[in-house]
Regions:
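Conserved nucleotide-binding/hydrolysis micro-motifs of P-loop NTPases
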Residues: 49, 68, 93-94, 110-114, ...
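Helical mechanochemical/support elements of P-loop NTPase systems and associated helical scaffolds
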Residues: 25, 50, 71, 113-117, ...
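A short beta-strand element within the Helicase C-terminal
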Residues: 88, 94-111, 116-117, 132-138
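Long, largely alpha-helical accessory region at the distal end of helicase-like NTP-driven motors
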Residues: 164-178
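Conserved segment of the helicase C-terminal RecA-like domain
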Residues: 123-154
Length: 178
């Protein structure tokens, strides 16, 4: 143990919490929600604290591993029916849950895991006739989130999609990394 180590860790955790749920991110989320009122949206966070904080600020239902099975089923049923157009979650929807009704995902914060990110992308890409899906990833400028996001986007799932968009004319020369 180093002197000041505990203080350094607390400072790092505080910086990370601020980056994960900043006022700027909340404003962007709110803007996306306002512009997409008819869509079903899943908002992903890195941890329960961030999910609960956002849920309280935005008055939205939150699903975490602490949510009891019956309540989780109720939330998902209400989401599928459209009664709840938005769900906030930390990691509980990363794997094994089909929600083809979701057409937009917003990653407010996440881990450095490419697998987690691809799983989250998979939540909104589930097949449904005529469906188009969008995934927004919000990163705080000047933080480690930028580096982690850049690294994740090198995954072959993104490369294949970029190539498809390029061939269809959605991406022009010089825009491949945007």
């Amino acid at each position: 143990r180093l002197p000041g180590g505990r203080d350094a860790m607390k400072a790092y955790q505080k910086q990370r919490a601020i980056a994960q749920c900043s006022r700027a991110k909340l404003n962007i989320v709110w803007g996306i929600l306002r512009e997409n009122r008819k869509e079903r949206i899943i908002i992903f966070t890195a941890d329960n604290d961030t999910a609960y904080r956002m849920g309280e600020l935005l008055c939205m239902p939150v699903l975490t591993h602490k949510t009891k099975a019956a309540e989780r089923k109720d939330f998902l049923d209400r989401f599928r029916s459209g009664e709840y157009p938005v769900l906030l979650t930390s990691k509980v929807l990363n794997e094994g849950v089909d929600v083809p009704e979701a057409s937009i995902g917003i990653v407010v914060s996440g881990s450095g895991s490419t697998r987690e990110h691809v799983q989250r992308l998979g939540r909104i890409l589930r097949a449904k006739d005529g469906k188009q899906a969008l995934l927004y990833e919000l990163v705080s400028d000047g933080t480690s989130e930028m580096r982690v996001s850049d690294r994740r986007r090198q995954h072959r799932a993104y490369e294949q999609r970029r190539l498809q968009f390029y061939r269809q004319g959605y991406i022009k020369d010089g825009q491949e990394n945007n």
